[in-house]
Amino acid sequence: MNFFTSAVGSKVFKRNNFKYVAIAASSIGLAAYHIRKDAIALDIPNSTYQHVSKNRVPPTDGDGITKRLKEFERTVTVNKDGIFRYDFNQVASNDPCEDDHVEVIDRNIDEGNWYFWGIFDGHSGWNTSLFLRQHLVPAVVRELQKCTASYYHQNACPSSLALDKSISEAFAKVDHQIVHEHVSHVFNNPESLQVAASLLLPALSGSCALLTSYSAKSKSLQVACTGDSRAVLGECTPDGSWEAIPLSRDQTGMNPDEASRLEVEHPGEEVLRNNRILGRLMPSRAFGDARYKWSQEISERLHREYFSASPIPVKTPPYVTAVPEIESITVNPKKHRFLIMASDGLWDTMSSEQAVQLVGEWADTVLGKTTNEKNTTQDDKQSWSLFKKTSKVIDDNAATHLIRHSLGGSDQRISALLTLTYPISRRYRDDITVTVIFFDEKTL
């Protein structure tokens, strides 16, 4: 969403509002004022910055379309710990893109590597997704270190339940920092509107979060989902077909379990209207979105002192939580071949089963043809050749392959969609961010 026309844009802050919001927008580093001092330095294989397209001319032919689709794609070859490689790509609809992402390796949790892949689907601005990219993985690492340390003297690995609890606590702490600690700091330092802008913007906007963690030591995979991004595992079945194994559930008002949870937490109150929180917000779980979490007293004080927009009437907040649902699985690379993670921009146009089929066909063509013939058994040759090809494979990056098909597949269809620029583009497509992780037993 364009910063200066969004709900957290030029009309948010009172008293020379444009000046101070402009400062916050151009210098988001001001948020470092409140970065925790115990932040952990992590190994990031590739830089993870928000992507701003340099291609302002709409593509009109196949080469132009491919160039636009490949602008931010990346392939990282790992070749160890059961991971062959991972592919990433992103195509924006908003300007700037509200999605963000992170890929991290940490070596300080236990005796092996821990891998993290995150996708953060922002809404009402990019500030919350940016904050999550900077802070969520370090927070999770801190909690996992505490968890594994408690098992060290037992010479044992933590249970899945223990790991899940640690990840959930990290999610909750980060959201508490965004929503409550920051506003307390603002109230205690009322003279600094610059700091107020930098601290409150991540609370005013919002973001879903999909974070996958993988332990090289135990081969345990945890997928933590807050919101409606999605993760699905591609499993090779004994008969040579592919099966889509869901590792997350979309958390919206259309999810019956989420609707029931909200009814229990807010008895007698109509929380869902048209399947949206208070008739406004689609995801039922998210970071930020503080208007649905602050008390009426806090919202009204912020309105008096900082905001020009009126607060949402609330009775029993919070209506939205950042506590994730977590699915855990022990990876068996013989059958668990790949994991697809994507923001809802992809899932708006295809099912989990379609995505797994597309990646399976892509792997058949691209990974199959790169097999080393001299060091490969017949079973290995066939391992990526399980499908009759039904879709044209143009890309050597699986994430790009998925995005191409989500936009229609044909050059004519993709060109029409990419010709539309923000804000008109938002009527037809969302930001799309995709990561595909490939597992391989030969890298163990």
From Swiss-Prot:
Its cofactor is Mg(2+); Mn(2+). It comes from the Eukaryota. Binds 2 magnesium or manganese ions per subunit. The keyword Cell inner membrane does not apply. It is found in: Mitochondrion. One of its GO terms (cellular component) is mitochondrion. Its EC number is 3.1.3.16. Keywords: Hydrolase, Magnesium, Manganese, Metal-binding, Mitochondrion, Protein phosphatase. Residues 85-439 form the PPM-type phosphatase domain. Mn(2+) 1 binds at residues 121-122. The keyword Hydrolase applies. It is an enzyme of class 3 (hydrolase). GO terms for molecular function: [pyruvate dehydrogenase (acetyl-transferring)]-phosphatase activity; metal ion binding. Its main location: mitochondrion. Pfam families: PP2C (PF00481). It catalyses: O-phospho-L-seryl-[protein] + H2O = L-seryl-[protein] + phosphate; O-phospho-L-threonyl-[protein] + H2O = L-threonyl-[protein] + phosphate. Belongs to the PP2C family. Involved in regulation of pyruvate dehydrogenase activity. This is Protein phosphatase 2C homolog C10F6.17c. The lineage of its organism: Eukaryota, Fungi, Dikarya, Ascomycota, Taphrinomycotina.
